[in-house]
């Protein structure tokens, strides 16, 4: 097993797929997105890395896809189970695509949503509404312990509000207004958000590969 780590015992029985995240918001969101997409895979069959006691690898990739693969490879090796990971972020046009892969730690401390939002809005304080274009991007990766890998990508294009609005979601959801709507992602219901989100797109595209892996239809890599 890669890195000489012992395989995690994990929760008993029904676990068939592990998600490479310690963010419970993401675990719930990804369970909802995959619900019904994989025959025989219920919520109890999907657990997050934190529930297995897995540590987070260093994300030193240069793209969302590279970081998603880093996380999925590490968790597949640790757990001995198929692993799914995503790497996502906000890409702002006038910032040349930043924060991008640094979205979660834009203000310096990883996962400080309030600080990240405050810094971003301060940086855009003098930017007119017509120049506040942005998009969420998500790369979703599936990796099996025997080396099979598959990556899909999704995008949600919109513009940035002047101030945060809404109480749903997480991250930059309170400031991204999807094209064709007047509400921020944080003002959408979870169902509405998952139907259009970058993460929803990427994981729905990944679902057929997950089905194939869990049903034994994907041959071992190499």
Predicted regions, residues:
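Anionic-ligand binding patches
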Residues: 2-18, 24-222
């Amino acid at each position: 097993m890669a890195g000489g780590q012992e395989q995690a015992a994990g929760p008993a029985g029904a676990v068939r797929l592990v998600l490479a995240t310690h963010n419970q918001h993401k675990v719930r969101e990804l369970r909802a997105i995959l619900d019904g997409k994989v025959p025989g895979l219920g919520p109890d069959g999907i657990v997050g890395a934190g529930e297995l006691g897995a540590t987070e690898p260093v994300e030193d990739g240069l793209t969302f896809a590279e970081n998603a693969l880093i996380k999925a490879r590490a968790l597949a090796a640790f757990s001995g189970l198929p692993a799914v990971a995503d790497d996502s972020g906000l890409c702002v046009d006038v910032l040349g695509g930043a924060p991008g892969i640094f979205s979660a730690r834009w203000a310096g401390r990883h996962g400080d949503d309030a600080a990240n939002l405050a810094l971003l809005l301060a940086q855009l304080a003098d930017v007119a509404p017509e120049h506040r274009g942005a998009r969420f991007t998500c790369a979703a990766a599936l990796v099996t312990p025997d080396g099979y890998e598959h990556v899909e990508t999704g995008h949600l294009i919109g513009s940035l509000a002047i101030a945060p609005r809404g109480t749903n979601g997480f991250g930059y959801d309170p400031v991204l207004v999807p094209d064709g709507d007047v509400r921020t992602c944080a003002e959408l219901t979870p169902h509405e958000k998952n139907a259009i989100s970058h993460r929803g797109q990427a994981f729905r595209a990944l679902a057929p590969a997950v089905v194939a892996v869990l049903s034994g239809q994907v041959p071992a890599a190499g």
